[in-house]
Each structure stands twice: as structure tokens, then as C-alpha cells.
Amino acid sequence: MHEFELLLVVRPDLTEQSVKQVIEKAEEYICRVGGKVSKAENWGLKRIAYEINGFDKAYYMLIMYSAPYVSSKSLQEIIKEDKDILHHMIIRQ
């Protein structure tokens, strides 16, 4: 198992409940590919460096997890399908 950080940039027009659901879905995705979440943080609504899909602000979320290395590619494919996530980045620790 390897340690990873998943940074999510989420649509700013979601309700607080919807933002929580995005975190829950991401944690579910991680578990589905064989990982285990160790920490999840909602950094809140922040201005982004450039517009994405017409938005100049977005919610930032950081999820730290451990998983087999091969699962990261599967996780990326799942995340790409989620319309609430504007951008994501997975970093191996």
C-alpha cells in the first residue's frame, strides 16, 4: 500500500450538503478501488488561478489515503466522470 493525497476542486454553486456528498462519494471511490481514507479536509471556497467552466472560485478538498499503486488509475477514471469535480490531482507521498 502506498500513501496518496487527492486534491479535489469542486463546483462553487453546490449547497453545503452537496459539497459534503462530494467528499463522501470520493471516499467511497477510494474504498471501491481498495484504498483506506486516513484524513479528509474541506478547505472551503477559494478563488482559483484561472477560470474552469466559467467559475473563478471553487471548493478545495484534500483527502489523504493509502491504496495499492495500480488503483490510482482506476480512481482517476471514476473521478473524471463526476460532473461536480472541476479538477483533481493525485500525489504519491
Question: Predicted segments — roles?
Answer:
Residues M1-A58, S66-Q93:
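Long, contiguous binding/interaction regions
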